[in-house]
């Protein structure tokens, strides 16, 4: 019988305090170290691992450059523990624009980066989408072709088209909001489908690309104003940190209710024949009534606010330091 070569990987689930970079980096560092102690060689942190995102204008002051404290944490932990480590953060470029940038390091060396293609809902207030030529391919590690995707990129068919046939593994993560809990009846009606989407879209992408996915996430409760509406959002981030194989099968998983922690699994870092063609449509799944409404309303309001308050602004002097190694 032939032995199948596998790699131990970890997807991290973080209880994030939105906007508190110092706290979040310390929590991420602790989880990375837990994963390393458990033998993980590849470790995924989620989208916005350093700050989280909500409609909180002060987040502008937490935007870093590509060599800021959050990138330094990724690099130093990857180097110290000799692992592959990735995550995304709000990153200001030299031209003054801001991107949601995913960086991946191998043993302390930058493998590559990817800027999320389109901001989701009120994220539009803090960054703009990546360049059209950015496929999400990060590079090659020991012969393994590595790609990434974050959050609603898993919901768009374009992501599967970009990565199909080009990667052996996808390392990424999400920052996926629940339906507002303000109205219990509406929440109980709409939230099950939203929560299902937050995991099934990742499984669908794995199946359509034919590559395993290491998917990190957040699981915190939070509230914030709703842009353009006289309401306060009260809800949570969905959790769903997971390791998924190239057939879309769930190997290991952590729910919102299970809180922060490490999802560990052994996977084969190798592309397989995709299970189905990529659907000929924009969205992989129906978004649901409230997410679709928010996509349009908060996208318009957010883009306007970004142009007026974020784009072109000079980076503030960093007052946050990466946790001591």
Task: Give names to the regions the model predicted.
Residues 66, 92-200, 257, 274, ...:
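Active-site catalytic loop in hydrolytic enzyme cores
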Residues 21, 25, 29-111, 176-211:
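Cys-nucleophile CN-hydrolase/nitrilase-fold catalytic domain and related Cys-dependent amidase chemistry
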Residues 66-86, 155-261:
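CN hydrolase (nitrilase-like) catalytic-core segments centered on the catalytic cysteine
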Residues 12, 114, 139, 216, ...:
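Hydrophobic residues at beta-strand termini and immediately following loops
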Residues 13-18:
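Short polar catalytic/cofactor-binding loops
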Residues 4-11:
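Extreme N-terminal starter segment of soluble prokaryotic enzymes
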């Amino acid at each position: 019988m032939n032995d199948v070569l596998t790699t131990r990987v970890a997807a991290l689930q973080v209880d994030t305090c939105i906007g508190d970079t110092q706290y979040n980096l310390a929590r991420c560092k602790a989880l990375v170290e837990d994963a390393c102690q458990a033998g993980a060689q590849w470790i995924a942190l989620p989208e916005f691992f350093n700050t989280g995102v909500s409609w909180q204008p002060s987040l502008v002051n937490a935007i870093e450059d590509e060599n800021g404290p959050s990138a330094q944490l990724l690099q130093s932990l990857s180097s110290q523990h000799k692992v592959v480590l990735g995550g995304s953060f709000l990153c200001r470029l030299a031209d003054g624009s801001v991107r949601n940038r995913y960086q991946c390091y191998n043993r302390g060396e930058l493998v590559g980066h990817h800027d999320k293609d389109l901001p989701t809902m009120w994220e539009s207030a803090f960054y703009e989408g990546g360049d059209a030529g950015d496929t999400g391919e990060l590079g090659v590690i020991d012969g393994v072709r590595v790609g990434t995707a974050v959050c609603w990129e898993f919901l768009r068919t374009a992501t599967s088209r970009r990565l199909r046939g080009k990667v052996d593994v996808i390392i990424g993560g999400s920052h996926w909001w629940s339906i507002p809990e303000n109205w219990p009846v509406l929440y109980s009606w709409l939230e099950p489908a939203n929560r299902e989407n937050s995991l099934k879209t990742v499984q669908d992408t794995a199946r359509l690309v034919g590559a395993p996915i290491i998917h990190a996430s957040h699981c915190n409760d939070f509230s914030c104003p709703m842009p353009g509406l006289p309401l306060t959002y009260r809800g949570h981030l969905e959790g769903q940190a997971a390791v998924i194989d190239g057939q879309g099968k769930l190997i290991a998983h952590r729910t919102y209710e299970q809180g922060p922690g490490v999802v560990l699994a052994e996977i084969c870092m190798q592309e397989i024949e995709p299970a189905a063609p990529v659907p000929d449509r924009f969205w992989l799944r129906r978004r649901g009534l409230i997410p679709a409404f928010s996509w349009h309303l908060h996208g318009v309001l957010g883009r306007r606010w970004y142009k007026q308050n974020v784009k072109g602004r000079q980076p503030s002097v960093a007052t946050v330091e990466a946790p001591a190694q």
